[in-house]
Amino acid sequence: GMDFDARSADRLPFHDDDEVTPALGPTSSDARLRHLERVPLFSGFSEDELRRIVDRSRIVEVAAGTVVTEMGEPGDSFFVIIDGTVAARTPIGAGSELKPGDFFGEMSLLDGEPRSATIVASTDLRLLVVDRTHFWHLLDETPDLIRRILTILSRRVRRLEQTVHAILRGTSPA
């Protein structure tokens, strides 16, 4: 329901695992594990590593049109898209799309600053959600995850640099 997690600054009309909608099916840890196995971010992880992620996260279902994070708000959760797509709106880039396997919300956890983007569910979503405390524990326990997140963040920074250069040159980026 609406009070799904009083500590979370991401005020989301989530359905938590306790009151799951029928569409979501079973939410046993085995079912959650199956979901995680489909996420490229976790590909090649051992069963143990995946179980650690399952233990430190929850899977929630969000209706299309829901604002998942609001730019300028404090952020306390890291999100990985399992099913569905979201639109990310930032001050400079309206509407990059994130798809299954993509993650968001990491920047506020890493630097403590407010959300840098407004993220809206374009479709019904199934999200893996990790809160701040669990996020740091998870990074301690799963060094591979740090490497992967850093690699992806580096790519994002490069893309952003290319976009900025293209704007400065007066051409639009590819």
Give, region by region, the residue ranges found by the protein language model:
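Cytosolic regulatory regions built on CNB/CRP/Popeye-like sensor folds
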Residues: 1-174
